[in-house]
């Protein structure tokens, strides 16, 4: 039953490959991680830590979360805040429906955090 629930949740995942802001390489690595490449587009800084609240809102609008994007504005989530968010913050703090919240965290917030950490650890 748990597997069928998860399959249903992930069945309608928005493809991060079509991000206008990021040039995303969705090639799966051996460990299951995803490579993400960055480029400046739509006037947003390439580093999410430099995003203003409206950059975050526009990012989520462009990746298919039009309804949910307003929650980031209401909670005043800028790039630095976005990079600090935990799974629990996204699932409960934004008061979003569970399905979209899971997708937002797993396919957008988490990869942005991972990319940011990689770029700033060297």
Curated annotation (Swiss-Prot):
Domain of life where this protein originates: Eukaryota
InterPro entries: PcG_chromatin_remod_factors, SAM, SAM/pointed_sf
Domain SAM: 51-119
Pfam family, one: SAM_1
Entry protein name: Sterile alpha motif domain-containing protein 13
Family matches, as PANTHER family: ATHERIN-RELATED (PTHR12247:SF139), POLYCOMB GROUP PROTEIN (PTHR12247)
